[in-house]
Amino acid sequence: HWHIEPSSKCSLKCPRCPRQEHPDISWMQKEISLTEFKRVFTKDMLDQAQRFTMCGDVGDPIYAKDYIDIIDYIKSHNPEIQIFTITNGSYKTEKWWKKFAAVSNKHDTINFSVDGYDQKSNDLYRINSHWDSIMHGMKICANESDMFVNWATIVFKFNETHLLQIKGLAKEQGCDDLQLTYSTKFGSKYGDAYGGEYDLLEPSAKFVSKSHRYERHTINLSGRRPMRLQYMKTNFKKFNEIKKQFTGDVVPMCLIGNRGLYMNAEGTIFPCSWTSFPYKSLEHNGKVINWEDSFFVKNKHLVNAKGNRSIEEILNDDIWQTLFDS
């Protein structure tokens, strides 16, 4: 399982995206070209791949100029490799969506991240989104391909009383699932970051995750199920093998491929996407470490697949194991 950020570009300004939360950090405006992707993911590499999750930490995959060509390259090698696209869906033309639908098949899934029920409400969080182009693209994916179409909504204060309306819209658009996310990024969880009790986005307590990780609740609309059998079998096998190494109840999900090895739009490889977010500073073993002085930043050139090193060289290098252990 690979998690790829085809593009670090985005047209939206979602307030709780790292782009907006850390305006002092200069975010990359990068993308992966077809030539770069083919150099990194050779046919031998694709022989080992079962799934690609296409989702940026700070960008949207559909804004990579070669995104459709990249999917076509993967599918031409093995049409059963699963492509999971996560997008806000804004600003693409009918022609683009028809091409996207043509290279996709029943093994693929697309998540449209839509929190509203019209342009005005969607813009309350997905600031600068474009409702009509989202709905048009969603309809084409549902009607002109066999891919699994998922409408994904984060529950906020402004939409919690409109969930039935959103469900109706999702069904009308031909979506297979409605996915409701109960987030943690609210004032009651992180008061200093989100204004405590004055957080205007926070919904009723029942729609806030009970843990420190988001919760997802899925409502099936079509009777179809996404085709993930082989990928899930592989994860389950890895889980049972790795579980023996841990005495506690928690098995790191990155070790079984649940998140996937992550390559961002710059070409840098990470153990998983959670480890790719820059931080100002943190304390580790009683020592304060600034991001720019961290082990990873100092050795980033050694784990970059856009350079002269292959993925095999990176993953077999001692520096990778040191990074993973750190």
Label each PLM-derived region with a short phrase:
Residues 1-109, 124, 132:
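Conserved alpha-helical substructure of the radical SAM core
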Residues 5, 20-32, 47, 68, ...:
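Radical SAM enzyme [4Fe-4S]-AdoMet core and its adjacent flexible, acidic
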Residues 10, 14-17, 254, 272, ...:
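Short cysteine clusters
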Residues 26, 53, 151, 323-324:
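Short, hydrophobic secondary-structure boundary micro-motifs
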Residues 41, 71, 75, 167, ...:
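Non-transmembrane alpha-helical segments in soluble domains
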Residues 301-326:
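Cysteine/selenocysteine-centered motifs that mediate thiol-based redox chemistry or coordinate metal-sulfur cofactors
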